From Swiss-Prot:
UniProt KW keywords: ATP-binding, Ligase, Nucleotide-binding, Protein biosynthesis
UniProt-recorded name of the protein: Aspartyl/glutamyl-tRNA(Asn/Gln) amidotransferase subunit B
GO molecular function: asparaginyl-tRNA synthase (glutamine-hydrolyzing) activity; ATP binding; glutaminyl-tRNA synthase (glutamine-hydrolyzing) activity
Reactions catalysed according to its record: L-glutamyl-tRNA(Gln) + L-glutamine + ATP + H2O = L-glutaminyl-tRNA(Gln) + L-glutamate + ADP + phosphate + H(+); L-aspartyl-tRNA(Asn) + L-glutamine + ATP + H2O = L-asparaginyl-tRNA(Asn) + L-glutamate + ADP + phosphate + 2 H(+)
Gene3D superfamilies: 1.10.10.410, GatB domain, N-terminal subdomain
Task performed by this protein: Allows the formation of correctly charged Asn-tRNA(Asn) or Gln-tRNA(Gln) through the transamidation of misacylated Asp-tRNA(Asn) or Glu-tRNA(Gln) in organisms which lack either or both of asparaginyl-tRNA or glutaminyl-tRNA synthetases. The reaction takes place in the presence of glutamine and ATP through an activated phospho-Asp-tRNA(Asn) or phospho-Glu-tRNA(Gln).
Sequence similarity: Belongs to the GatB/GatE family. GatB subfamily.
Taxonomic lineage of the native organism: Bacteria, Pseudomonadati, Pseudomonadota, Alphaproteobacteria, Hyphomicrobiales
Annotated PROSITE patterns: GATB
Length: 500
């Protein structure tokens, strides 16, 4: 692969060193486990968490005479992902044998795709920001290719004092290796890229994106150079399994390489591991090139071929993807780019929001979902899938505000009750006496009492009318937040002679 530089050096992303500024160059190879019921070349289950060696067929164990048979659903999922990445779909691709020895690779080779992958060049648009002015920066990251391959098994070295065990449950599970171009120039860009890629495959339903389960992991290629110079020698950081760790690994590795180069040394092309405990990378082995694996077409598998009708049928059924959904939220619902970005970041959040916003004011629904619901979930350490407040319940709270049954302040208290205890919002308001006071006589009495008790404050307000809000706050406090704020404000202005 010929590396092409598509970016102009950005001063904001340069790293200062003893000999001047340095630029990081980052490319990523993301392994995404295909969402399918069975493996790439066998009928064995892909269920996560089963007992060791439960999900193993004779094909996965590489028993003599066992031949691979392609799983059509895995092919469909790869094509769907390619379409979601705006990539070229190759209607003819070839499976190759990648030869190397490892105890958890029973065949002695991995079935992958080398020269002729199923998906060619595509792109992802990432957004950084907002900055202090509220602006976002959109950056296009090129996709070099996507190919299908088998996952390996898992070696376990902590089960016995003198022996290592091998679990082949993962052996033969379908992976999509999504290879980016070296277009990223900072750890923030790399994290944004991984976040966006995970969001896309989750929207498509082609990978669950659960990095903690190993179903999505990244090999991060890092090099440094003087701004605009030739590409440096890259090091590959293997199997990084969290977005936060990706950022930490890049920051450490870039500074390690800069220190070596500024000391007059050179960078060795190697594979490294990231140690999250120490926050540093360490050498694993020298980096192999393609010829070290002796790739050749797998003689047990015919070339994979399909027609344009196959691709078009999949394209027709693609769901709305994050960028399109964000554009619709901004154009049709009047949301800010920031709010729309938050809501589309995860498919589950977007689905929840759309259920709440159906038939209601989109901006009000967005405020409640982002500020109240997501804030409460974050504080509780929960994800949107674990929310105790259903879209119907949150929509019910919004409806009660619109009907002026409760005030905005009472709505916050009501949300907290629903979040912690559950229940129907309307029933809770009725049973706990939380209805808004709309009786102007009762509100007027409270206003009169507070004005009479605070003559000094009255004088201040008459001198500076903008201070009238103090009286509104006191009345709301006196009524336990149940008074209608608009009615209170009107009465305060009338009593103090502040009407326009």
């Amino acid at each position: 692969m010929t590396l092409v530089d598509t970016r102009t050096p950005d001063p904001k992303r340069l790293i200062p060193g003893a000999t001047g500024d340095w630029e990081i160059v980052i490319g990523m190879e993301v392994h995404a486990q295909v969402l399918s019921q069975s493996k790439l070349f066998s009928g064995a289950s892909t269920t996560f968490g089963n007992a060791p060696n439960d999900n193993v067929s004779l094909v996965d164990a590489a028993m003599p005479g066992m031949l691979p048979v392609i799983n059509e659903e895995c092919v469909r999922q790869a094509v769907r992902t390619g379409l979601g990445l705006k990539a070229k779909i190759n209607k003819r691709s070839i499976f190759d044998r990648k030869n190397y020895f490892y105890p958890d690779l029973p065949q002695g080779y991995q079935i992958s795709q080398f020269k002729d992958p199923i998906v060619g060049e595509g792109k992802i648009i990432i957004s950084l920001g907002p900055d202090r002015q509220g602006n976002f920066e959109d950056i296009e990251i090129g996709i070099e290719r996507l190919h299908l391959e088998q996952d390996a098994g898992k070696s376990m070295h902590d089960q016995h004092p003198t022996m290592s065990y091998v679990d082949l449950n993962r052996s033969g599970v379908a992976l999509m290796e999504i290879v980016s171009k070296p277009d990223m120039r900072s750890s923030d860009e790399a994290k944004a890229y991984m976040t966006k890629l995970r969001s896309i495959v989750r929207y498509l339903g082609t990978c669950d994106g659960n990095m903690d389960e190993g179903s999505m992991r990244a090999d991060v290629n890092v090099s440094v150079r003087k701004p605009g110079g030739e590409f440096g020698t890259r090091c590959e950081i293997k199997n990084v399994n969290s977005i936060r760790f990706i950022g930490q690994a890049i920051e450490y590795e870039a500074r390690r390489q800069i220190a070596i180069l500024e000391d007059g040394g050179s960078i060795d092309q190697e594979t490294r591991l990231f140690d999250p405990g120490k926050g540093e990378t360490r050498s694993m082995r020298s980096k192999e090139d393609a010829h070290d694996y002796r790739y050749f077409p797998d003689p047990d598998l015919l070339p994979l071929e399909f027609d344009d009708a196959f691709v078009q049928a999949l394209k027709k059924d693609l769901p709305e993807l994050p960028d399109d959904k964000k554009a619709r939220f901004v154009a049709s619902l009047g949301l800010s780019v920031y709010d729309a970005s938050v809501l589309v970041s995860e498919k589950a959040i977007a689905d929840y929001y759309e259920a709440v916003a159906a038939g209601r004011d989109g901006k009000i629904a967005a405020n409640w979902v982002i500020n109240d619901l997501l804030g409460a979930l974050n504080k509780a350490g929960k994800g949107i899938e674990e929310t105790p407040v259903s879209p119907a319940q949150l929509g019910g709270i919004i409806d009660l505000i619109k009907a002026e049954t409760i005030s905005g302040k009472i709505a916050k208290d009501l949300f907290e009750i629903v979040f912690n205890e559950g229940g129907d919002p309307a029933d809770i308001v009725e049973s706990r006496g939380m209805k808004q006071v709309t009786d102007t006589g009762a509100i007027e009495k409270a206003v009169d009492e507070i004005i009479a008790a605070n003559p000094d404050q009255v004088a201040k307000v008459l001198a500076k009318p903008t201070l009238a809000g103090w009286f509104v706050g006191q009345v709301m406090k006196a009524t336990g937040g149940k008074a209608n704020p608009q009615a209170v404000q009107a009465l305060v202005k009338a009593k103090l002679g502040l009407e326009e």
